[in-house]
Amino acid sequence: YKTQIVQAPQMTMTSHLAKENQAEAAINGSYFNVKTGAPTTFIRLDGIVRGETTRAEAFRTDGAISTDKNKIKIHAFDSITSKKLGKKYKNILAAGPLLLKNGVRQMAPTFPENTGKATKGNAHSSDVPQGFFKRHPRAFIGITPDNQIMMVVVDGRFKKHSVGMSIDELSYLAKQLGMRDALNLDGGGSSTLWNN
């Protein structure tokens, strides 16, 4: 299958975007401005930068997914690697947190009680909202050791049905599913998985 990153010119449903691009399967991507639909994380499509990571998203944007010659890769991504990776790959989308890299669970920021400050992990800011790491609906993409792509959505916010997962639980799930690399995508109400 051909694997690609696509961006709608305006806010649209994952299913509509998938159908427009004749996709067999699709998952929502990274974070965006809910008023304008503009991306709030780095995205480069067909060699053109379409968005940069905003300061508000930097705390959780420590990974990226690229497509090149129908291959997908998941990378560690920060302000230093963004320029290098952004030039190397014509199609790349930043997101996060990074859940797995080479089979190793990545450490999410932790919060000592009553401090409200992140002290460990991949935090880029001490202003990480604690709520981000609570259980929520989640979406993530991963690659197995034999280069199979897995797209996963975890439902949430329904007490009797599903409460969602924390970032730590999500990285554990990615490991249990046999992924080598995995990247969290925009979750919450954006969590969408579609197949034809």
Task: Annotate each PLM feature.
Residues E24-N28, G63-S66, K73-I74, F140-G142, ...:
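Structural recognition of the beta-strand scaffold that forms the well-ordered cores
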Residues V34-P39, H75-A76, K83-L85, A108-P109, ...:
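Extracytoplasmic/secreted cell-surface and envelope-processing proteins
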Residues K35, S66-K73, F77, K101-G103, ...:
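Short acidic-glycine loop/turn motifs at beta-strand connectors
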Residues G103-R105, T110-F111, G116-Q176:
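Domain-core and long-helix interface of multi-subunit machines
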Residues S171-N196:
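Charged catalytic cores and adjacent phosphate/nucleic-acid-binding surfaces used
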